[in-house]
């Protein structure tokens, strides 16, 4: 497992521990190294992780390294963001989204 700042890299091996069994709500980004839009979201995701430390666990999964996870959640386009509570997928967004949209899919601005 690699951690970039406050963002945890998730794979099929550690998904259960990092996402399904997480005590905090989780925001999981599905991305690909070759994806330009994913690169555009990296600063937004890093800011979200920093500002929500201790309230939301931020993770990311590379669809090329963990295709089973992408398939399990029906991810066909990247970047894709899915929020989890109690290990269950809740809300999702796809594409380049503003910071506020990440708050909204995590249920932080209802």
Regions found by a protein language model. Give the residues of each.
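Short, thiol/selenol-centered motifs that function as redox-active sites or metal-ligating centers
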Residues: 34-41
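CheY-like receiver
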Residues: 18, 69-72, 105
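Thiol-based oxidoreductase modules, predominantly thioredoxin-like and allied folds used
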Residues: 9-10, 30, 42-49, 53-68, ...
């Amino acid at each position: 497992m690699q951690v970039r700042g406050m963002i945890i890299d998730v794979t099929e091996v550690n998904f259960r521990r990092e996402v399904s069994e997480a005590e905090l709500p989780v925001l999981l980004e599905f991305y690909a190294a070759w994806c330009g839009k994913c690169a555009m979201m990296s600063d937004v995701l890093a800011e979200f992780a920093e500002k929500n430390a201790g309230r939301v666990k931020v993770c990311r999964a590379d669809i090329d390294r963990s295709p089973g996870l992408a398939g399990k959640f029906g991810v066909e386009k990247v970047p894709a963001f899915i929020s989890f509570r109690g290990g269950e997928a809740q809300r999702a967004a796809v594409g380049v989204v503003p910071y506020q949209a990440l708050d909204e899919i995590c249920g932080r601005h209802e």
